[in-house]
Every structure is written in C-alpha cells, then in structure tokens.
C-alpha cells in the first residue's frame, strides 16, 4: 500500500476516474445554492441531486469530485471518537444513467488494489452487501475477493423518502489485531457495529429503484436510468494510508494540533486525554471553510451551528490553558494544509480571521455573563438550603452561555454542590428532539420524470429579439407526449424561442403564441428549463396546436424591459456593495421581477444608512454615466482573466456569457440585459433587512417605480411639514426635533411630578406594617397609572427600613399588576409571587429581591392581600 499525503490521495482519486472518462466536478460551496432542503452541503452527491432526479441532464454522465462537506447532527461526539468530524471531504464517482454495478465494483477494486494506484493489499479488504443483491456478491467474487471477506448486512439498502434508491455495498479495511485484542471485530462488522479494526473507507450505492413510501420495497419500480453514487471519506483514507491511529494523526489535522501545542504549552498525546486538541482542530477547519463560503456566526440556522462550534472550541482552549483569543491564529494553518485544492481559505484569510476573532471576543464577554449566572444560581441554592444544581439550569448554562457540563460540574463541586446529570440529559434530549423535528430532510431527490427527461429535440433561445416564427417540436399534456392539443394547459418546446426561461434570478418571460392568421392560440404563463436544457413553455391553450406547425412567438416586451432594468441594476448594485462594504459581500440569492429587484448578500451586520446612501448614489452615478453594456461568449478561464465575477457555488458550462457594464461591472450571467445603463433611468433602495445569520437583503426599484418611491417619500414629507407647521420642507426636520425636545422635557417634568406624588402617597401606604412568622410586611392596594409607578413605590420603600417585605397590587384598566419586593434572604420575591399571582388569575416571576406579575381578576385583589401573611 502506498503511503500518500492527503493531497496526493485526492489527486490520485480524481486522476483515476478521469482515466475512466469522468469529468471533474469542482467542489461546491458549503452553503447550498437553490436547495432549501439542506442546511449544509453534507455529501458528495448533495450538489448533484438535479442530475439524479432527472431535472437536469449532465453534459457528461460520468462525474467525479472531491466535495467539502459539513455534518453537525452529533457535535458532542467530535473529539471523543477517532473518526467523527464536522467538516470533512467526500471523494466520489457518479454515473448518471451510464455504467452500473459491474463497472462500479471492478473499477473501484482496481483503484484500491492496482500497483499503479493505491495498491491496497487485497487480503486487507472486506465488503458488505445487501443479502438480496446477489449480483454485487458475484461481481466481487469475479474480482478475486474471497467469499469469507464478503459480509451480508440487511441494512445495506439506501433510501431517504421518495426518489432514487437501491442496495449499497461498502468496502472496509482491516487494520489488524492490534486494533482488535478481543478478536471480535469481524462479528461486530457482521452486526453492522462500528469498530476500530474494520474501518469503512468507501460506500457504493447502486441506485436502481424509484422508492415510493406507499408501497413495500419489493414493489419499487426500476428507474428509467440507473445511477451510481459513491462516497469515500478522504480523512479515513488518509488515516489508513498514512498508518495513523486516528484521523487526527494525519497530515490533515496534525499541523493544526502542533500550532495548538505552541499556543497552549501542552503536548498532544495520541494515547492520552487529547479531546480538546481534536475538538479545536476539527472545529477551526469547519469554521474556516464555512465562513469563507459566506456563512457567518449567528443565533439561528447555520449561523447558530458556527457559533456553537466556535464556543465549544474556545472552551476546550480554556481547558488547555489558552485564555486569550486564539482560534483566529489557526486559520492560516488550515489554509496552508488545504491550499492545493481549496485556495479560497487563504484568499479570504483576512476576512475569516476578522470574523473568528470578533466572535471570540464576544464570547469572552458571554463567558463572564455565564459565570455571573452560575454564581447567582449557587447563591440561590445556598439561600434555599439545597445541595444540587438542577439539570434545567445546567442545560441553560450549556445552551445559552456555551458552558460545557464539565466546567459547570467543576465549579459547582468546588462550591460544595452536586450535579443533576439526569435532569441535564432530559433537557438535552428535549432540545435534540426539537431540533430533529425542525430539520428538513435533505436526502430525497424526488421522482425522475421520464417524459421530460426524454425530450432530446434541440431548442435555441434567441437573446436579441422579442418576436420570431418557429416550428413547434414537442407538446406534453397530462405528462404525456402528444401530437396535438386544443384546450387546457400544456408544455411546449419550439425549435427556437424569444422566451427567456427562468434562471439566475431572472423571472421567465410571458407572452403569446399566434398562428399564421395572427390569432392568439396560447398564452405563455411560465418558461422553465427542461432536464436537457430546452426552454419549456407552460401555456394556457386557447385553440388547436400541433407538432410540426410554425407559430409566431411574441414576448411581453414592456415586461421584459422592466425586468432587464432590474437585472442590469442588480449587477451595478453588486459592484457597489463590493466598493462600499467590502468584497465579502457576495451574492447569496437574487430575484429580478417586473416591479422590483431583490438582492441577498453575505454581510455580518446591518448596512448603515450612510452606507446605503453611498451605495444608492454610486449605482445612480453609473446610470447617469450612460455605460455601454456588452456581452461576450467565452470559456470560464478567459472570463476570469477579464475580471468576471463568478457566483461561488454556481456551476458553469464550457462556454459562459460575460456581461460587462462599462469598466464598472463584469459578471458571468446568462440573463438578458439593457444596451446602456442609462435605460435604467433611476435606482432607489426601499428596504434593507437581515434574512438569516450573516445574510442581508436589499430590495430596490428602478425607472418608473423608483420615481414613484421618491414621490411617495416627498408626499409624506409634505404631510409632516404641514402637520408641524414648517414653512418649507427643509425646515421640517428641525421642527420635528424641536417638538421632540419639548415633549421630552414635558415627559421628564411629568415623571418628576409622578415621583413626588408617589413619594407623598408612599407615606400613607408604608404606615400599615404587619408581621407574620417574624417577618414584617406591607400589603396594600394602590391607585397608579402604570406598572412603572409600582416600581417607583418599591424604590422609595428600599430607601428606608419600613418593612422586610412589600406587596403592592394595582388594578390598571382591565389588568391586575402585582409587585413583591424583599429585603430578607428568608423571603424569595420570585417564589412568593408565583404563589400569589394565581389568586388574581395571573402568573409571573422574578429575582429574590424583586418580582412582578400580571393578572386579570380584579375581584380577587382583597383575597390576594389577605393571603400575604400565609405566604410570607
């Protein structure tokens, strides 16, 4: 077996499959493009779903890739096991309706065992297979595999929901008796239990059925096109071929671990407690790649995942004695390890480091807050005479503040308290159940549509015309091809068409189809790409249509021009964002409609009003500069040399279309555009908002809509000016400010009067002091305007020694407000109000010294006041 670096393994994999006629699919962005079913790209096949479900036919049905992936369904185990990772690389080879079982197995065996390639010892390889899949068993035998090395496993059948499914056969490497002292590894393998001796290195999925949850597996229909989908983890292959005990001792992780050793002053021991080293090395890889691909730490979705990874890594850094920010210092090492195939980490190093460091600094403040929260919890336990920290409180520290359970346990035990482990596990399970219920399953690829996939007739979109005559090539009605149709809805393909099919954020054209008499025979309501790329017109049929007949196709020209204004403006906006807020502001989605444009982009904070003003100004300057717009068709490399901005994560063919707006913007784009930027007329941003962690959205309008937006703003300003009696529009702001200042002064004066009135009233309220169980208390109903006045009473009460406990009740409108304040450790205000509030049909809570509640039954106020003596 050859001893290869991870980069050599990756390259040899790709070279082998290229020698078998496969095209190399570049690794896609970790943030899925146009796939809401996935949080992350989590496998090599995840970016190829469109090929497997038949919605798109690839140029080459044989594909290979090395795909960076992230899985975060079991973060707690990362660092505890030898092979568990969040970010990993999946090597794959795929056949879309081309070769199948025989070639997949034979070529896979050749790659692994041939001296020209990996050169694995044949006697070290074991294969599992689905018991009913005799063809795979026989093919392995034909390759020279001993029957004793073939293990049947009932679970070797791949299916997730409806869509492509089939048996799979897995390849394992035997690492020898040193990893199996009890000699039970083969039994564990047969029972489908992971073990350290027999390591799975490759899985070959034989996708031959259309899974249908409504029928038993034996009744699944054969796919019209059988597919091969395989995955081999680079980290596992590297561990085996480099003789490493775990994945972490390979060249993919050890350089990071060495840097952590320098930062911590600790030494990594492969046989000792090394969990913290592993966690940090794994998590900084995931963070570096994900942030480089446009995901940013946040409080939801993939942003929450990144924040959780970073905080977990920071806490493990503290366990190693690293108390300052340090993770950002590891980004360079990650980039250097992966540079040969993934240069983007080093290219975006400054930005990634900035985000990681800022998040570390924020978390440092959060840790301080968490420590304060834990101190409060322990103080409360002491006051209540309890000796155990509850599981729900441990979970809150873990989930909200990022405190590992071990740290909470250590601090609590140092203070003399026990830990409710079972309660914590229960709270953790509840959260995991909620998370699983919320996750959209991403494996199902949908049913293949044989009718659409079978359209092979050529069809060409004509960019430079709004109307043309063309022959009708294909009619599909009720999912069947037909020669003619006279009513209902149908799908049509023409030899050529002026109708743009929805793509790249630009909506489809609409329009009409006319016969040779000039009569409208169909209305085009939508145009989408067929699996083989033809524009597929969805039409409402008004009169007879037949294959082979020529028709005149007319798009709605006015609508197209409105869409083009927004699309061209989108390119200008993208360039302006780069200039104003930074090149990290890359496109995360767009929509170019008739009435508006919507542009989503990666950015870590709200765009300020001043920045929005600069962006808007810059776009309009380019409109007024009347820049010529040109389009060029060329190859991707030439386009990049021209400075074309490619959208990361998008797949481009051999020939790409470059849209250039003067010297201001150059992008790869297949959409339609104006001839000159001046045709946009006017550009106005109407909204900027966050739509998710690390993603912002701008909605803007152009032309007539932009003019209307400005006029609406002017009308609103005129109305305000008239209301505040400003002599001119430019004076309105000063008038409003003057009114605001006057209102603030009046409010301040009013508040002072209220305080004086409350102080005067307090004298009467605080006279009635009662006593129960050795505690002095005041319980009174007061007449106040709002709940804030109750707090003012409490503030006055705290200034003097009126009593130990204060209970105030006020009927404000239809609601009842209750306040409990305590100066003694013997009475917990929060607990007391929980007992009192239900009397007035309310609930509430608070801290030991102050608590408030709201209720709805004012008729029970007297009963509540009477109950205070028993509750104290």
Swiss-Prot record:
Query: Bound how, and how many: what does the cofactor note say?
Result: Binds 1 zinc ion per subunit.
Q: Where in the cell is it found?
A: Cytoplasm
Principal location class = cytoplasm
Cofactor(s) recorded for this entry are: Zn(2+)
> What would you give as a GO molecular function for this chain, any one?
catalytic activity, acting on a protein
- Annotated binding of Zn(2+), by residue: 567, 571, 669, 673
One Pfam family named in its UniProt record? tRNA-synt_2c
**Which E.C. number(s) belong to this protein?**
6.1.1.7
- Top-tier EC class: ligase
BP terms from Gene Ontology: alanyl-tRNA aminoacylation
Q: Does the keyword Nucleotide-binding apply?
A: yes
Q: Which HAMAP family match?
A: Ala_tRNA_synth_B (MF_00036_B)
Q: Which family does it belong to?
A: Belongs to the class-II aminoacyl-tRNA synthetase family.
Summarizing the function annotation, the protein's role is: Catalyzes the attachment of alanine to tRNA(Ala) in a two-step reaction: alanine is first activated by ATP to form Ala-AMP and then transferred to the acceptor end of tRNA(Ala). Also edits incorrectly charged Ser-tRNA(Ala) and Gly-tRNA(Ala) via its editing domain.
The entry's free-text remark on domains says: Consists of three domains; the N-terminal catalytic domain, the editing domain and the C-terminal C-Ala domain. The editing domain removes incorrectly charged amino acids, while the C-Ala domain, along with tRNA(Ala), serves as a bridge to cooperatively bring together the editing and aminoacylation centers thus stimulating deacylation of misacylated tRNAs.
Q: What is this protein called?
A: Alanine--tRNA ligase
Q: What's the name of its gene?
A: alaS
């Amino acid at each position: 077996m050859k001893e290869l670096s991870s980069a050599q393994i990756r390259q040899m994999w790709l070279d082998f499959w290229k020698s078998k006629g496969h095209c190399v699919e570049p690794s896609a962005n970790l943030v899925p493009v146009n796939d809401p079913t996935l949080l992350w790209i989590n496998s090599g096949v995840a970016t190829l779903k469109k090929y497997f479900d038949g919605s798109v036919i690839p140029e080459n049905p044989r594909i290979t890739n090395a795909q960076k992936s992230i899985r975060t369904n079991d973060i707690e185990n990362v660092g505890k096991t030898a092979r568990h990772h969040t970010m990993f690389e999946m090597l794959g080879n795929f056949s879309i309706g081309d070769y199948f079982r025989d070639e997949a197995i034979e070529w896979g065996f050749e790659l692994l065992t041939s001296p020209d390639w990996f050169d694995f010892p044949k006697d070290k390889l074991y294969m599992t297979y689905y018991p009913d899949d005799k063809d795979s068993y026989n093919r392995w035998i034909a390759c020279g595999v001993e029957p004793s090395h073939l293990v049947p496993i009932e679970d070797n059948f791949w299916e997730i929901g409806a869509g492509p499914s089939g048996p799979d056969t897995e390849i394992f490497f035997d690492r020898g008796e040193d990893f199996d002292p009890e000699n039970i590894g083969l039994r564990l393998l047969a029972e489908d239990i992971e073990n350290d001796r027999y390591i799975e290195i490759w899985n070959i999925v034989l996708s031959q059925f259309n899974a249908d949850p409504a029928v038993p597996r034996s009744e699944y229909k054969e796919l019209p096109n059988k597919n091969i989908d395989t995955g081999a983890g680079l980290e596992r292959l590297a561990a085996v071929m480099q003789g490493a005990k775990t994945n972490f001792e390979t060249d993919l992780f050890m350089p990071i671990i060495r840097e952590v050793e320098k930062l911590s002053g600790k030494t990594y021991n492969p046989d000792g407690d090394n969990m913290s080293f592993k966690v940090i090395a794994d998590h900084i890889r995931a963070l570096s790649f994900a942030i480089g691909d446009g995901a940013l730490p946040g409080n939801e979705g993939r942003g929450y995942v990144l924040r959780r990874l970073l905080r977990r890594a920071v806490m493990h850094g503290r366990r190693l004695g690293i108390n300052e920010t340090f993770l950002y210092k590891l980004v360079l090492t990650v980039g250097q390890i992966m540079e040969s195939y993934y240069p983007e980490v080093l290219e975006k190093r400054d930005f990634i480091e900035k985000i990681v460091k800022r998040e570390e600094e924020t978390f440092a403040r959060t840790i301080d807050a968490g420590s304060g929260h834990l101190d409060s919890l322990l103080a409360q336990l002491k006051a209540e005479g309890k000796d155990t920290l509850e599981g729900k409180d441990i979970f809150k520290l873990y989930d909200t503040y990022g405190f590992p359970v071990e740290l909470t346990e250590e601090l609590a035990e140092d203070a003399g308290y026990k830990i409710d482990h079972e309660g914590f596990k229960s709270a953790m399970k509840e959260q995991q159940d909620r998370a699983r219920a919320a996750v959209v399953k991403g494996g199902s690829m949908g049913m293949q549509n044989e009718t659409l996939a079978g359209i092979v007739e050529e069809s060409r979109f004509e960019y430079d015309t709004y109307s043309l005559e063309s022959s009708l090539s294909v009619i599909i009605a009720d999912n069947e091809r037909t020669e003619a149709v006279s009513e209902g809805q149908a799908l049509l393909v023409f030899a050529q068409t002026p109708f743009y099919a929805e793509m790249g954020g630009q909506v489809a054209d609409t329009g009409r189809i006319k016969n040779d008499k000039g009569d409208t025979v169909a209305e085009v309501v939508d145009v989408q790409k067929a699996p083989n790329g033809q524009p597929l017109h969805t039409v409402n049929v008004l009169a007879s249509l037949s294959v082979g007949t020529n028709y005149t196709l007319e798009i709605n020209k006015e609508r197209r021009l409105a869409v083009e204004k927004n699309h061209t403006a989108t390119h200008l906006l993208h360039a302006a964002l780069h200039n104003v807020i930074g090149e990290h502001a890359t496109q995360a989605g767009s929509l170019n409609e008739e009435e508006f444009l919507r542009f989503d982009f990666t950015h870590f904070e709200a765009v300020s009003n001043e920045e929005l003003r600069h962006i808007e100004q810059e776009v309009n300057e380019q409109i007024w500069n009347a820049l010529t717009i040109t389009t060029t068709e060329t190859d991707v490399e030439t386009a990049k040399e021209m400075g074309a901005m490619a959208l990361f994560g998008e797949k481009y063919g051999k020939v790409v279309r470059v849209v250039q707006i003067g010297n201001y913007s150059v992008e790869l784009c297949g959409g339609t555009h104006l001839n000159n930027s001046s045709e946009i007329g006017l550009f106005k941003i109407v909204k900027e908002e966050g739509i998710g962690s690390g993603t912002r959205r701008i909605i803007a309008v152009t032309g007539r809509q932009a003019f209307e937006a400005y006029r609406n703003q002017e009308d609103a300003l005129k109305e305000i000016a008239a209301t505040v009696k400003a002599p001119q529009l430019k004076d309105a702001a000063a008038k409003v400010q003057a009114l605001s200042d006057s209102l603030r002064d009046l409010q301040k004066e009013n508040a002072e009067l209220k305080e004086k009135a409350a102080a005067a009233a307090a004298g009467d309220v605080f006279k009635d002091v009662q006593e129960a169980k050795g505690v002095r208390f005041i319980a009174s109903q007061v007449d106040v305007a709002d709940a804030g006045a109750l707090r003012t009473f409490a503030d006055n009460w705290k200034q003097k020694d009126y009593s130990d406990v204060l209970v105030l009740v006020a009927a404000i409108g239809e609601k009842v407000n209750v306040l409990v304040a305590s100066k003694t450790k013997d009475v917990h205000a929060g607990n007391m109000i929980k007992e009192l509030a239900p009397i007035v049909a309310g609930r509430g809570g608070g801290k030991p010294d102050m608590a408030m509640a709201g209720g709805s039954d004012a008729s029970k106020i007297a009963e509540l006041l009477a109950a205070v003596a028993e509750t104290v």
